[in-house]
């Protein structure tokens, strides 16, 4: 403690002392003083700041106590998405992952990986500007999270100010908030003493504590933060490796898990995995596996991402926990697509940190395969957040009165017929929108964050709206009045007004999200986006023939049929028309993709027709390619086919034209192909020239600094629409660097390499030239 009589110097000295002790305790795992001494100095600082309020600083340790409760959390758009990871469940899958890495990098050398325990907590993003913590956010759906800055400031292992003078201008840190076992036990003891509900496991306790609207509650909870990556770095030289990045985070005062190691090759990874697995029960926090990441950042950039996960990382999951219990009964749930799912009602049992009383049985085939009966003693499996499932029965313990399990003959909800094709695993209710459960689940899906993202419209409110018969379809949501909503239980005028405002805000939505929200069978986010990108507008998708749908990336035969069947159903068409009439406006380019139109050749149409059942058996793709290039139109092909054998182009075997003539005459295939051809011609007339639609093809762009009019993720998507590859670091292959406010080391490197640099205004001008609004992405 300082003896200086200047209060400001005293306060600064006390803050420095406490921050240094916190760094020694949390980062170096080397406590410098007993807790009692820390508490004495903390009280001295608190007393001094109370005497001189002007001396309180944002990074003072006394400011971790929490603030007045919030009404709700603000939404935060992640500039760099917080992605999930692919999983490996055994050694073979890990070897396969390593093989994919080396093949994609085209290297034969052994790869260095960073191996780290996979903490079972809540993923969090911390944003520092000029060393000060300015924002903390939850992962959310990876694109949008919640602003938890006030709560994060109460966590002792979260630095309010980065350590040292040489800190980045802008740093986004990713990590995990966990609750240690000892703290969890103490918290539950307090809950029990107060007559409150106990937490099932440390993960639930951590998540519930971090998402408290009253940060004073968060401050009272024993939470800890471990940093594991950085998403943004400006004003500081980017480290060359992941391990060097972790060293930098430690130097700046962030806590990094002490178990993390650099491993040379897969065998070293497996040794690390086994070591952590053996150490697992002795750790003071929950882990559910190990994460492996390619150490070199340049290799990470080269490997890139697939869908919602990086190619350069994988989670090696631990074996799941299993327990025995008794199957008391089976209920059948109906999902939004009508699928019937059997749910096991179990004698409650403690599995993997939670009490399990329900578990999935998957489907009737699985029940029969496992010969599971009501009354059986069964094995229940649970891994992390995976829904518990019954994996087998113990016939030797089967009671004499055990009952078999049969598929219901009619829907347990609406009484409609249950249909199941001879080759179908899933049985479905045919009730459609008259089935209350299907209607209910379809509306919940429509409102969900990854779909229309209607803030405040949660599952319980949807249940209430359906139960009160205020809505029967998703279009009815946009006909709701505030007074109708305000009359519901636990809803008031303010909540009702907020919901109506959220519904209004959701009307402008990307076409891909809109298609996903409709809940078309087998259509996920990626397929919905591909449909939007290929066709360019909703009307074209609604009227697209199966022959064209099959040409869309990732659309197979069953998916194409599902899309066609959905838009052919009059009830679905009425719902879509109702949404449009209420002002819902799906946003897209308005024109088909030039690359997609170019792919719709006569040969492609013939291949699609073959998959749909046109009798082209024995005619291979090579022959179809020759026919498609030799004849310009379906009419020309039909005329040649009518000539029969001998009219085949070179490279096509004799007899094909005779077979083709017969096939074209069956089931109106000639007319169907000609209709598709006309659609293609119309799309070609509306599509931009290919070079105009992909003006940045083959170029690598880099984004740096803060963009003001849209996020970096939106800018990235917009550039990708123009054909550019967006990289995370500057190299000699970079074509352009977009520099926003506070651009740092990337800008400096670009200037040193003589790479062209543009600002946000120039980027926006380029995007406007090509009709792209990044704010709508």
Curated annotation (Swiss-Prot):
**GO annotation, biological process:** DNA repair; DNA replication
The prosthetic group or cofactor this protein requires is: Mg(2+); Mn(2+)
Query: Where, in this chain's numbering, is Zn(2+) bound?
Result: 411, 414, 429, 435
Is Metal-binding included in the keywords of this UniProt record?
Answer: yes
Using the record's annotation, list all stretches that form the BRCT domain: 691-777
Q: Cellular component per GO?
A: cytosol
In short, the EC number is: 6.5.1.2
Listed SMART domains? BRCT, HhH1, LIGANc
Provide this UniProt record's keywords sorted from A to Z. DNA damage, DNA repair, DNA replication, Ligase, Magnesium, Manganese, Metal-binding, NAD, Zinc
- InterPro entries from the UniProt entry: BRCT_dom, BRCT_dom_sf, DisA/LigA_HHH, DNA_ligase, DNA_ligase_AS, DNA_ligase_CS, DNAligase_adenylation, DNAligase_N
Q: Which reaction does it catalyse?
A: NAD(+) + (deoxyribonucleotide)n-3'-hydroxyl + 5'-phospho-(deoxyribonucleotide)m = (deoxyribonucleotide)n+m + AMP + beta-nicotinamide D-nucleotide
| Binding-site list for NAD(+) | 35-39, 84-85, 116, 139, 176, 293, 317
Q: Where is the signal peptide?
A: none
Q: Where is the active site?
A: 118
User: Is this entry keyworded rRNA processing?
Assistant: no
A molecular function GO annotation: DNA binding
PANTHER family in the record: CHROMOSOME TRANSMISSION FIDELITY FACTOR 18 (PTHR23389), DNA LIGASE (PTHR23389:SF9)
Function of the molecule: DNA ligase that catalyzes the formation of phosphodiester linkages between 5'-phosphoryl and 3'-hydroxyl groups in double-stranded DNA using NAD as a coenzyme and as the energy source for the reaction. It is essential for DNA replication and repair of damaged DNA.
Spell out the family assignment given in the record's similarity comment: Belongs to the NAD-dependent DNA ligase family. LigA subfamily.
Q: What is this protein called?
A: DNA ligase
Q: Which organism is it from?
A: Alcanivorax borkumensis (strain ATCC 700651 / DSM 11573 / NCIMB 13689 / SK2)
